[in-house]
């Protein structure tokens, strides 16, 4: 199974990538944005997620069966100070990945954040309606 981890050099991506590589049957390819990874145990692609042409190229070359989307601007303060850029990356980038997954018949696994909830209640469940109170949560 060909797995593409978009945002594979981030905190969750690094651990997920290692686990998948250790298991047989997974051909793992990952992307990074600003810092090239130090390990060379698999294929890496440089990707600025708002570069739709580059994203198209990666999908054509990798031909993933599964895409795990982890790329985002996740620092709340950075998002609040640069809302337009955060929307481009976190919303438009995700939309493009979703479109390409549909086009290439790849399953999409998208991880989100607890910031989609207001945070005043706690113990949220998967079927609770989102009610973000930050731009990061909205993106």
Task: For each feature predicted by the language model, list its residue ranges.
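N-terminal Rossmann-fold cofactor-binding loop
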Residues: 30-37, 48-49
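Catalytic helix-loop patch of NAD(P)-dependent Rossmann-fold dehydrogenases
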Residues: 88-96, 116-139
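NAD(P)-cofactor binding segment of oxidoreductase domains
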Residues: 67, 81-109
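N-terminal Rossmann NAD(P)H-binding glycine-rich loop of SDR-like oxidoreductase domains
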Residues: 1-23
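SDR active-site strand-loop-helix element
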Residues: 6, 31, 67-71, 108-113, ...
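NAD(P)H-binding glycine-rich loop region in Rossmannoid oxidoreductase-like domains
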Residues: 46-89
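A generic structural motif
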Residues: 23-29
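Helix C-cap/helix->beta junction micro-motif
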Residues: 24, 62, 103-104
